[in-house]
């Protein structure tokens, strides 16, 4: 697996205006330099990929979230930065690169946050299913009335 940092001016072949690159790979350091992180294969086996986005929905920003059951999650400038393994492997202190607050969460606290999001999603799905049922029921009633009227 190859992981590299490139200065933004060296990053020629990818359109950085594309939202997916802005969200995952762009990082502005405290000294004002802009860098882009490229990883040829993402390994998300140890992190539920939805957790960082759930935390962002909870209003977390410019935080390093440490947990006992998950890899560290850095949410910086409203972006989930997915390069902490690379930084750690190369003895680069993320604390020296960007300014953020460190938050310690137990795995069960993260799971509660996840569960709240899952409950909200289940309620949304149930509402959608109810709307589909009601529309289907109304359609059947209209068709039945139409059939009896034609007879």
From Swiss-Prot:
It is a single-pass membrane protein. Its main location: membrane. This is Toxin coregulated pilus biosynthesis protein R. GO terms for cellular component: plasma membrane. Involved in TCP pilus biogenesis. The chain crosses the membrane at residues 132-151. Keywords: Cell membrane, Membrane, Transmembrane, Transmembrane helix. It is found in: Cell membrane.
